[in-house]
Amino acid sequence: MNVKIDNSWRKHIGAEFEKPYFTQLTDFVRQEYSTTACYPPGSLVFNAFNLCPFDAVKVVIIGQDPYHEPGQAQGLSFSVPAGVPFPPSLQNIFKEIQLDLGKPIPQTGDLTRWAEQGVLLLNATLTVRAHQAASHQRHGWEQFTDAAISALSAEREHLVFILWGGYARSKKQLIDRGRHLVLESVHPSPLSANRGGWFSNHHFSLCNAYLREHGEQEIDW
């Protein structure tokens, strides 16, 4: 696995690449990609970091692991390439944006436009075996992405961390609430959202209000 990651991130988490766990992780990922179908494509594994340099991050949305069906994963949490049908969680994200901000449902589920505005769409695990959710968990990715979250918390100010569902909410221990806004709710998956607590959480308007309050351009969701 060739680590092609924006240099701004190397300054802050580059030490992770030299640690034994990352060597083991690299060996595991190379073996997986060489012997079975895995997602996202190798060139997109670090897409979230490359589209959103460290000093440009305004918002962090934490996912669990990539979509595991063909043609969906593109290295950005919750995002799918243009032309791909919206997965159920993404449908509910767009419905909440419509409720919260009055914006129409977009034509594409490609969230690159968010990333380019400073939204780090970070899956805790950056790769997955085809058709097997969570298959690459507990091999080292979580240690790496925890380091990224911790670096942002310690070295930046006035970011918005958006945590949907129990897994993402477990990351709040890494975040200094005195320096940042943390927004939490249930996961947007239909199973969780339909029980209540997702719709009308107003995370998108709350996020933008906080950014404006601290002199930042709001996100065009």
What are the roles of these predicted feature ranges?
Residues 15-160, 168-170, 175, 181-184, ...:
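A polyanion-binding, active-site-adjacent surface
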Residues 1-13:
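Generic N-terminal amphipathic, Lys/Arg-enriched alpha-helix
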